[in-house]
Amino acid sequence: MTKFVFVTGGVVSSIGKGIVAASLGRLLKSRNYTVSILKLDPYINVDPGTMSPYQHGEVFVTDDGAETDLDLGHYERFTDTNMSKLNNVTTGAIYQAVIHKERRGDYQGSTVQVIPHVTQEIKERIRRVARETNPDVVLVEVGGTVGDIESLPFLEAIRQFRKDVGRANVAYVHVTLVPLIKAAGEMKTKPTQHSVKELRSIGIQPDVLVCRCEQPLPRGIKEKISEFCDVPVECVIQAQDAPSIYDVPLVLEQEGLAQRVLEILNLDPQQPDLREWELLVQRLHHPQEQVEIAIVGKYVRLTDAYLSVAEALRHAGLALNAGVTLRWISSEEIEERGPEALLSGVDGVVVPGGFGNRGIEGKVASICYVRERGIPFLGLCLGMQCAVIDWGCHIAQLERANSYEFDPDTPHPVISLLPEQKDVEDLGGTLRLGLYPCRIMPNTLAAKLYGEAIIYERHRHRYEFNNAYRSLFLDSGYVISGVSPDNRLVEIIELPSHPFFIATQFHPEFRSRPNRPHPLFLGLIEAALRSRPQPRPLQLQKMG
């Protein structure tokens, strides 16, 4: 029977529940257990697709086209397992389903209430993950903080769940904070005690406490937490701040988290095989070379808006024994100061995705700058569209060339609305979403990087290259190196006269893994290394 581990958080938000859940997933997988991870988000949005990146961070897209919480990116990268729409559930989606059932008459005249109808729907979503993916263990991260009114239905549902499936089949892991009062030099356990008290008042007794801390927890502090929170001292897990998120699985393994959870679930605590992960962490902390990559974006005030892009760059650096330093640059600041002032000295540039016309001129100016100076460049989604606008304006001599999204009155809409989007009125869930095939043209940079004729990548867009300008762009030196199998949609463009200039309509960052870096990011970092004073031979690897 599938076992269930529920991960909750207390004291403060953003305490690291997602990384703890992802790390535990990695540790269980290293013991040959299959895992699936579900994120329960307490906001009333049906999904994060229409939320501001400044409020939510990145929207992570799965193969089946779900727009999900960025934690699903951590789950995929840490467990090397694809997630789906099953793995992210929001309050909005729960209430939408409950109201739909009520309108359909499923409740047969009952008064629809939080208990039992909403909690039953939540439990059904948890069971559905177990039923359809059939893992040994389902990890469930409950978003928000214990005490938040929005989280109460989820906490009540997971309280009931242990009774429904049996005590031996459920473990509760609570992530909390043990702050250090630096003026006094003391670590305080009261926030943890009150957080557990709040959780117990709901009816949940945590089995394991994962305590975030700046310094190692003394034995006496662990014993005090154990005494006041009614948790065995060996189940008080120290989670000291780590140099990187990729250190966390090793930190938690050293503390015995996976072993404690497996004992609670009556599963065999096998010996883990973490050799590959340990090698990754060793490479991360001891790079042989260093490169600096600029990310020119609209939302750089919150770098989590580009989380998968940043991680994909680091993955490529790991494979090449190179440390990757990121220079975050606002495209609006480039509009004010010019690209020379902000991009000078970088080894490569990424222009990632986004929506709306704010900061677009800065993105286009950045692309023009790297194109003219031979700086390695990778454009993603909107980044490709801006590269097309740059070429249309400056090389193809199309006056006021632009995207229809930014200027509906442009005489040259080199980027146009997808035909199937013309009658769409709703914003949420209506983009071209999910995994689609792409045919790679032979004898191109894309063909060299991928090493395959047909690839599959994840999309999230509403606009596309305007085929009315395809011949003009080809005649002026552009190469279209990737198209949809029916040749209708342009998916990859590149410049053969440039050392490394490639841009995609899709989002390759979503498929990069620490142990399997994406070939486009690998190519960018390798090109950045070659552009430095001591060039290195090409060491590209195919995606597995």
Curated annotation (Swiss-Prot):
**Ranges where the Glutamine amidotransferase type-1 domain occurs:** 292-534
Q: Where is CTP bound in this sequence?
A: S13, D148, I149, E150, K188, T189, K190, P191, T192, Q193, K224
| Residues holding Mg(2+) | D71, E141
Query: Which PROSITE patterns does the record cross-reference, listed alphabetically?
Result: GATASE_TYPE_1 (PS51273)
Which CDD domains does UniProt cross-reference here? CTPS_N, GATase1_CTP_Synthase
One Pfam match, given by its short name, reads GATase
The region called Amidoligase domain is annotated at 1-267
Which UniProt key words apply to this protein? ATP-binding, Glutamine amidotransferase, Ligase, Magnesium, Metal-binding, Nucleotide-binding, Pyrimidine biosynthesis
Where UTP is bound, by residue? S13, K188, T189, K190, P191, T192, Q193, K224
The catalytic residues are C381, H507, E509
GO MF terms on file?
Answer: ATP binding; CTP synthase activity; glutaminase activity; identical protein binding; metal ion binding
> Is ATP-binding tagged as a keyword?
yes
Task: Give any extra note attached to this record.
Answer: CTPSs have evolved a hybrid strategy for distinguishing between UTP and CTP. The overlapping regions of the product feedback inhibitory and substrate sites recognize a common feature in both compounds, the triphosphate moiety. To differentiate isosteric substrate and product pyrimidine rings, an additional pocket far from the expected kinase/ligase catalytic site, specifically recognizes the cytosine and ribose portions of the product inhibitor.
Protein name per UniProt: CTP synthase
Q: Which organism is it from?
A: Synechococcus sp. (strain JA-2-3B'a(2-13)) (Cyanobacteria bacterium Yellowstone B-Prime)
Q: Which gene encodes it?
A: pyrG
